[in-house]
Amino acid sequence: MERDCMEFDVLIVGAGPAGLSAACRVKQLAMEKDQEISVCVVEKGSEVGAHILSGAVFETRSLDELFPDWEAMGAPLNTKVNQDKTYYLSNELNGHELPTWAVPNTLHNDGNYIISLGNLCRWMASQAENLGVEIYPGFSANRAIIDEQNRVCGVLTGDMGLDKNGEQKANYEPGIELRAKFTLFAEGARGHIGKQLINKFNLAEDKTPQHYAIGFKELWEIPAEQHQQGLVVHGLGWPLANEASGGSYLYHLEGNQVAVGLIVDLNYENPHLSPFDEFQRFKHHPMIEQYLQNGKRISYGARAIAKGGFHSLPTQQFAGGLLIGCDAGTLNSAKIKGTHTAMKSGMLAAEAVFEAVSNQSVIADYQSHFKQSWLYEELYQARNFSSGIHRFGSWLGGGLAMLEHNVLKGKAKWNVRCEHPDHQSLILAENSDEILYPKPDGVLSFDRLSSVYLSNIFHEEDQPCHLQLASQRIPIEQNLALYAEPAQRYCPAGVYEIVEGAEQAELQINAANCIHCKTCDIKDPSQNITWTPPEGGGGPNYPNM
């Protein structure tokens, strides 16, 4: 069966904030110059926003540039931040609010909004379509198409209708060739094609390894008397103080809803640590429980976050394409924000690509646009935030951040680099303390399976496993023997289980549970797991996240 082929001027992989901003900006520039430029966005989720997960406190700077009249246009920014608190939790019972002067200036949220990023992306998609962008949800980009001149010239979407053995079923449809003069990869953190392109074109040369965290989010409905619309709460300390770096958040949206979550850096050392269970017990702290008691959990999700910052940012341009947004790692960890930076990277990419298409150039000169932008300046000023915490721990690293941002106002002359990749950070299980987590009570804390249910997940059961092992032996002979197989604990969805086989223990992969967080691809100590996209349209369907 022959593959269909479609051709465009610009192809964008991923309908998140970076990809949609790029699509809108290309079409805006084409209209300004009275040119016809075709733009296509392909999205692996069942709809735009289905795979979008973020806190999210949103800085409007990029949106102000892209759509100055966004308020009149009905952008879903309904809750302005009106209170900003930071809690230090000293243990499971005690904590206190930090004074404003003790919090890095970058964490202040005056003028920002609490939003659903999924809903913002849905709104941006409608604006893109109004501008003439073609958007195709439910199609996963499987691999980049690279020609004989080593130029990226599009992507091949995944085949549909293969059974678990890779054989064609009655409904088989081959993937489609989507070809373009320029392809922008906006897959989010640890994008599977982006990862391949970084390696193929050596884009991370002289850069530090990218660093990641896993971010959890639950959406709750709470009683009106506990709701304080516009309140932003960030937390540090317990439960992560001694085992990992990271932090917590609780945001009061409209409609008596709160978003609560925990961010756990993936450079933690103890293989017995379970980020999911840390999140569940976090909600029992009295300073957090006060907001959630008598409430109802209505949604759950988790996603990897690329947080290495400026020192980890790869070269983003190559022949025929660009990496943008979290696919490259444009998040500003000093602000705990990545949406406005992802959007700006997409807009800069659009300007570079528009120039290249107009001039019939092979390479879009993104780097020049980037270095002349406020995005470059912002990421440069925040360059030592994540690496400082990774190198020196939460207290010394946090003190360095205070010095750089509150005293030196982002003008520090030194660089702090972290050369140690996250997957190499685990120590042996025999040298680690086991962690006994409390059983979930079904009121504030929950188990993995009931949580995954609230992600509205769907995968076709009879399809090839999208979680690929380079070696079937490593999970038992190395990971289980040395690290008590940490995949059982770092996965937030119960995908990986150790079961007793006929002769020895085996790793069972429950691929249908996967919520596409990419943590296994990042944290596996042997780098034995590769996350690949399942059939298009599969995965979580986040409604308001």
Where are these regions (language model features)?
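N-terminal FAD cofactor-binding segment of flavoenzymes
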Residues: K44-L93
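Predominantly flavin-linked oxidoreductase catalytic cores and closely associated redox partners
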Residues: G118, R122, Q127-Q290, L348, ...
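C-terminal auxiliary extensions adjacent to catalytic cores
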Residues: I389-V443
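Iron-sulfur cluster-binding cysteine motifs and their immediate structural context
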Residues: A481-A511, T519-N541
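Beta1/beta-strand and adjacent pyrophosphate-binding region of the FAD-binding site
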Residues: R3-A18, C40
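Active-site-proximal substrate-binding core of FAD-dependent oxidoreductases
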Residues: G329-K335, E351-S394, Q508-N510, P540
